[in-house]
Amino acid sequence: GRVDVLFNNAATDDETGCDTIATITQNVIDDTFAVNVRGSLLMTREFIKHRGDYGRIINISTDASQIFAGQITYGASKATLEALTRSIALEVAPYGITVNCVSPGPTQTGWIDDEFEKVVVPLIPMGKLIQPEDIAETVLFLASEQARMITGQVIKVSGGKAL
């Protein structure tokens, strides 16, 4: 059979979760871009090679792509993934393939402790953390026939935090 949907959801950040221009290392740059950009790009290339006349490619980014201090490599890698989403969308549109990106805000997947939640929730206009099902429902929509004319878009699922 064939694969109709590719979901690129790999991500890594450096071991401390933050880097600055003064502290960044080549290893952190290489490792972050290898997973967050090169991995998705190579998976997409293989998907395109084996495509028919239909397909959905959905990338996962983050609101950190809007650039936050102390997240240089992570934010830049996800901003690059968003740019690739738009470029690839133009290239493969004639083949009936859509390419979109979902950009979540702070999502409660177990890594947000009570202390961090108290800091971040006030920054979200809708007043609560994003849940994994919020992301999943957006991805399912983009993979569906209802989204057949949506391509090259970055869909922000952030409760209004990233506009």
Feature locations, PLM:
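A short, exposed helix-loop element centered on a Lys and neighboring polar residues
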Residues: 44-45, 86
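Conserved mid-core segment of classical short-chain dehydrogenase/reductases
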Residues: 12-30, 70-73, 111-114
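Short C-terminal tail/terminal secondary-structure segment
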Residues: 18, 139-140, 151-163
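Catalytic Tyr-X3-Lys loop
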Residues: 4, 22-41, 58, 81
